[in-house]
């Protein structure tokens, strides 16, 4: 298998404030977390894991041949859960890059995962994350995050507000991160910062501490499921692609 020095970790906890037992919600006849895992698994990497605190989630994943790492339910963030899971991977000294894929994107494209891995390996960035060019209507929801970058594609700032102000086209941030191992270790050692807590965006902790985040363009905005309304959209999308035989 390719990229033997890369681990993909999908953090997934059962408790959710906005959508009860979110990972186990059905899209068609398949749970959200199973759909995420199956999409990610198409990237073809050996070291692909779901990190969870739930026996129910673990059961779903192991039944389809996936690998699970149990992490403490008290872990505060997805990135912290990713790091805790990484430390429990057998022979992890051979892993130099870790990709954190959020467990709420049931139609994430495997090509996007491979793209950030290649970009991370061929750059000097601490972290790499995907972005999509979108218009104003596509990002008006408060759960969406936009980013501004410099001429080289280095992230300058992320926000839940539309930035830059007054623009008609924006860069939508896709919730997936590729870390160098030492960058992930540094990130989790840092305390939450003012901007991170204000915007409720973990990646600002990295920027406030001088870490570099590179961005790479991908084509499609993946559906993220955070609310009941998001779930309805995901089900509708699934029904539409099923009719087309995709």
From Swiss-Prot:
The record's EC number reads: 2.7.7.38
GO function term, MF aspect, one? 3-deoxy-manno-octulosonate cytidylyltransferase activity
| One Gene Ontology term from the biological process aspect of the record | lipopolysaccharide biosynthetic process
Record has Magnesium as a keyword: no
- Which key words tag this protein in UniProt? Cytoplasm, Lipopolysaccharide biosynthesis, Nucleotidyltransferase, Transferase
So, what pathway does this thing act in?
Nucleotide-sugar biosynthesis; CMP-3-deoxy-D-manno-octulosonate biosynthesis; CMP-3-deoxy-D-manno-octulosonate from 3-deoxy-D-manno-octulosonate and CTP: step 1/1; Bacterial outer membrane biogenesis; lipopolysaccharide biosynthesis
| Catalytic activity, reaction form | 3-deoxy-alpha-D-manno-oct-2-ulosonate + CTP = CMP-3-deoxy-beta-D-manno-octulosonate + diphosphate
What coarse category fits the chief subcellular location reported for this protein? cytoplasm
In terms of InterPro entries, this protein maps to:
Cytidylyl_trans, KdsB, Nucleotide-diphossugar_trans
Q: Which cysteines are joined by disulfide bonds?
A: none
Pfam families this protein is in? CTP_transf_3 (PF02348)
| Subcellular location, record wording | Cytoplasm
- What would be one Gene Ontology cellular-component term for the protein? cytosol
Superkingdom in the source lineage: Bacteria
Similarity comment: Belongs to the KdsB family.
PANTHER family (UniProt xref): 3-DEOXY-MANNO-OCTULOSONATE CYTIDYLYLTRANSFERASE (PTHR42866), 3-DEOXY-MANNO-OCTULOSONATE CYTIDYLYLTRANSFERASE, MITOCHONDRIAL (PTHR42866:SF2)
Protein task: Activates KDO (a required 8-carbon sugar) for incorporation into bacterial lipopolysaccharide in Gram-negative bacteria.
Protein's name in the database: 3-deoxy-manno-octulosonate cytidylyltransferase
Q: Which organism is it from?
A: Rickettsia rickettsii (strain Iowa)
Encoding gene, per UniProt annotation: kdsB
């Amino acid at each position: 298998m390719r990229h033997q020095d890369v681990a993909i970790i999908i953090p997934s906890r059962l408790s959710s404030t906005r959508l009860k037992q979110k990972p186990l919600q059905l899209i068609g006849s398949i749970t959200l977390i199973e759909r995420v895992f199956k999409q990610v698994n198409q990237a073809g990497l050996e070291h692909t894991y779901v990190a969870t605190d739930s026996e129910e989630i673990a059961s779903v994943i192991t039944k389809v041949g996936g690998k699970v790492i149990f992490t403490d339910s008290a872990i505060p963030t997805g990135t912290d859960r990713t790091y805790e899971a990484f430390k429990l991977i057998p022979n992890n000294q051979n892993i130099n890059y870790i990709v954190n894929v959020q467990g709420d994107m049931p139609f994430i494209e495997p090509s996007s995962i491979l793209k950030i891995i290649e970009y991370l390996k061929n750059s000097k960035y601490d972290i790499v994350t995907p972005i999509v060019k979108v218009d104003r209507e596509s990002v008006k929801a408060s759960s969406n995050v936009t980013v501004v970058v410099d001429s080289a594609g280095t992230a300058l700032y992320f926000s839940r507000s539309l930035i830059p102000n007054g623009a008609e086209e924006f860069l939508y941030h896709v919730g997936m991160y590729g870390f160098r191992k030492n960058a992930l270790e540094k990130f989790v050692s840092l305390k939450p910062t003012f901007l991170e807590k204000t915007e409720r965006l973990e990646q600002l902790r990295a920027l406030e501490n001088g870490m570099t985040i590179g961005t790479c363009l991908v084509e499609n905005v993946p559906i993220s499921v955070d609310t009941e309304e998001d779930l309805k959209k995901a089900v509708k999308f699934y029904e539409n692609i099923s009719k087309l035989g995709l």
